[in-house]
Regions:
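Short glycine-enriched, charge-decorated loop/helix-capping segments at active-site entrances
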Residues: 66-68, 209-215, 284-292
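Auxiliary Fe-S-binding modules of radical SAM enzymes
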Residues: 1-34, 227, 239-318
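Iron-sulfur cluster-binding cysteine motifs and their immediate structural context
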Residues: 50-57, 76-95, 105-121
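Flexible, acidic/Gly-rich N-terminal and inter-domain linker regions that tether
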Residues: 1-74, 78, 87-88
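Extended, non-globular alpha-helical segments
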Residues: 66-72, 119-134
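Conserved AdoMet/S-adenosylmethionine-binding subsite of the radical SAM
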Residues: 125-282
Length: 318
């Protein structure tokens, strides 16, 4: 019997109808937890990491992006925009984001796909109908559903409703979190989780504020809460050249984890990359770290060995 014909335990109407803002549902993911997974990416994040590879996730509301290389200057977008927020010239598309209401009329009118909407409103039940399509793959591979972002805890009611639907129907669940959230939001989601992927970016709170625009005291507090819950936990460290990949900084991060999480715990290192740079241009934003180079294999191995010296199992992702 296929997953499409499996019986489904429905959510209570009020839970299934809870709405969230989603910008991508990625099937067959193998990077966001064990096994084959579907990753649900949500809009909205309390951090503004200088290296963020998903700038389209930061704003909580839907937003229009543009790809100038596809624009043929037909003017259809300018004609249909009720806010007169779009103009075009020989250099491409200009969107006045103070005027734009993200109504998506320009996106629908564009014959070339030069305009794209990041973010759509969906109910928890609607998202579940999408992710349950691959239930047999989850069961066969030890996978499941991961909710990422942005920050999942930015939409706690929606995430709790979606995860409960998954768990009630035998699908393993996971979130990827930056850790910055109200305790109430975290506690609302924890009962429906099979695993947590928890980012630790910088040890010093002032440095954290400088590079992410938020201090890290609440993040460390929430790390303790997740660790105490007994839910399987993986620590993820995005390695940013010259910012947090030095020996001194990695030792400080390892010490924070040691002080707040009982071993054994796994640490995943995420090498720096520039895959998101093009999206900054599409959203009329500036990427601050374009001059940085990715780490060498030797540098990554040194970082891995340092983390392992603290008694952690450590992998390099990618």
């Amino acid at each position: 019997m296929t997953a499409e014909h499996d019986s489904v335990t429905p959510a209570p109407a009020d839970e299934g109808d809870i709405k969230g803002t989603v910008f991508n549902i990625q099937r067959y993911s193998i990077q966001d937890g064990p096994g084959i997974r579907t990753t649900v990416f949500l809009k909205g994040c309390p951090l503004r990491c200088a290296w963020c590879s998903n700038p389209e996730s930061q704003n909580a509301k839907p937003e229009v992006a543009h790809r100038d290389s596809l624009c043929i200057r037909c003017g259809r977008c300018t004609d249909v925009c009720p806010q007169k927020a779009i103009s075009t010239d020989e250099n491409g598309i200009f969107i006045d984001r103070q005027l734009c209401k993200s109504c998506a009329r320009c996106v629908d009118a564009c014959p070339q796909g030069a305009l794209k909407m990041y973010g759509v409103t969906m109910t928890a039940a609607e998202v579940f109908q999408q992710v349950r399509k691959d239930a047999e793959f989850y069961r066969g591979s030890g996978g499941g559903v991961t909710v990422s972002g942005g920050e999942p805890l930015f939409q706690p009611d929606f995430v709790a409703a979606l995860l409960k639907l998954c768990r009630d129907n035998g699908i393993e669940t996971c979130i990827e979190t930056c850790g910055l959230a109200k305790t109430d939001a975290l506690n609302k989601v924890l009962p429906y989780l099979s695993q947590v992927l928890f980012d630790i970016k910088l040890a010093d709170s002032n440095d954290h504020l400088k590079w992410t625009q938020a201090p890290n005291e609440a993040i460390v507090r929430n790390l303790r809460i997740v660790a105490a819950s007994g839910i399987p936990l993986i620590i993820r460290i995005p390695l940013i050249p010259g910012i947090n990949d030095t020996e001194d900084e990695l030792r400080k991060i390892a010490e924070i984890v040691s002080e707040n999480v009982e071993k054994p715990v796994k640490v995943n290192l995420l090498p720096y990359h520039k895959f998101g740079m093009g999206k900054y241009q599409m959203l009329d934003r500036e990427y601050q770290l374009g001059e940085l180079d990715t780490q060498t294999k030797d540098q990554l191995q040194e970082a891995k060995q340092l983390i392992e010296s603290y008694g952690f199992e450590c992998d390099i992702e990618g």
